[in-house]
Amino acid sequence: MKPKKPVLEKAVKKEIKTMLADLNAWQFMPMQNMGQSGVPDHIACVPKVITPDMVGKVVGLFVGIEAKALGKTPTPLQLHQLEGIEFAGGLAMYIHGVQAEPGNFEATKQVLRKAFDAE
């Protein structure tokens, strides 16, 4: 009998990606070594219906925010990603220069507070 081959990380990642897709989750895999260290291999927002036994418990809200300069709008791909987050129950938005004046992010905080209160 041949010894079993070890399961490679690549195969595990593929299974996780399939599982998340089956759950209708919005997901992405950040590029390794291209950002903040320690970020998980998979980032996802999985739809979750709040049940009576969950009332009163803290539940996280996945948030995706795209920042844009004044007069700029998200690309079609960026809008598609934001729509995916919303479809899965997360909060997605883009904030542009009008809402986030340099040096004065109080306006941005107000936009975020309003969005969270609407949920």
Descriptions of predicted regions:
Residues 1-119:
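Catalytic phosphate/metal-binding cores of nucleic-acid and nucleotide-processing enzymes, i.e., regions
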